[in-house]
Amino acid sequence: MAISKNLPILKNHFRKHWQERVKVHFDQAGKKVSRRNARAARAAKIAPRPLDLLRPVVRAPTVKYNRKVRAGRGFTLAEVKAAGLTAAYARTIGIAVDHRRQNRNQEIFDANVQRLKEYQSKIIVFPRDGKAPEAEQVLSAAATFPIAQPATDVEARAVQDNGESAFRTLRLARSEKKFRGIREKRAREKAEAEAEKKK
């Protein structure tokens, strides 16, 4: 909760001379410039290599976000192998590899293998020894290989009312599960009573 009004601060667990240790962000604008300059300096230092690593396409988890794809941490070992690379070599040419991630989706697997192959076709690998030839500098792998949202074409159709209610169906299913035991018990007792009457 933010502090408001000129009232005593509740639960103020401050130590002595706490005023000297208050963290302020008066340098926010300056830090922004510093970060930009640092990025530019690093780009010049490691040129013509890109600043960042190539990241995979992953589908975001949970029902709320799973209609979208985004950049993941790293390619799986299976994706790297399918693209004809080894994990150790892939890391040396600017490809992020995550040994923990598992492939549970064939569509995403195929998209990532294709992404790796496209990256391989466009990348220029210089020998470790010897002078690097003049080459166009790629500032960002993320900008060069962007992650696009897949198009979802849904055709418009007339609303159909077949008289069924999803709410009613769920309520009946829940009720069936809840009272199954007692209903089976009643049916069993009724059958036993019928058998006793026949005797």
Swiss-Prot record:
Any one of the GO BP annotations? macroautophagy
Presence of keyword Phosphoprotein: yes
**Which positions bear Phosphothreonine?**
144, 152
Report any Pfam family annotated for this entry.
Ribosomal_L13e
Going by the entry's taxonomy, the superkingdom of the source organism is recorded as Eukaryota
Cellular compartments annotated: Cytoplasm
What InterPro entries does its record include? Ribosomal_eL13, Ribosomal_eL13_CS
This protein's UniProt keywords = Cytoplasm, Phosphoprotein, Ribonucleoprotein, Ribosomal protein
Q: Could you confirm whether the keyword Phosphoprotein appears in this record?
A: yes
Principal localisation: cytoplasm
GO molecular function terms noted in the UniProt entry:
RNA binding; structural constituent of ribosome
Q: Provide one Gene Ontology cellular component.
A: cytosolic large ribosomal subunit
* Function (record text): Component of the ribosome, a large ribonucleoprotein complex responsible for the synthesis of proteins in the cell. The small ribosomal subunit (SSU) binds messenger RNAs (mRNAs) and translates the encoded message by selecting cognate aminoacyl-transfer RNA (tRNA) molecules. The large subunit (LSU) contains the ribosomal catalytic site termed the peptidyl transferase center (PTC), which catalyzes the formation of peptide bonds, thereby polymerizing the amino acids delivered by tRNAs into a polypeptide chain.
Subunit description: Component of the large ribosomal subunit (LSU). Mature yeast ribosomes consist of a small (40S) and a large (60S) subunit. The 40S small subunit contains 1 molecule of ribosomal RNA (18S rRNA) and 33 different proteins (encoded by 57 genes). The large 60S subunit contains 3 rRNA molecules (25S, 5.8S and 5S rRNA) and 46 different proteins (encoded by 81 genes).
- Family from the record: Belongs to the eukaryotic ribosomal protein eL13 family.
User: What other note does the entry give for this protein?
Assistant: Present with 54200 molecules/cell in log phase SD medium. There are 2 genes for eL13 in yeast.
Tell me the protein's name: Large ribosomal subunit protein eL13B
Give the species. Saccharomyces cerevisiae (strain ATCC 204508 / S288c)
Question: What's the name of its gene?
Answer: RPL13B
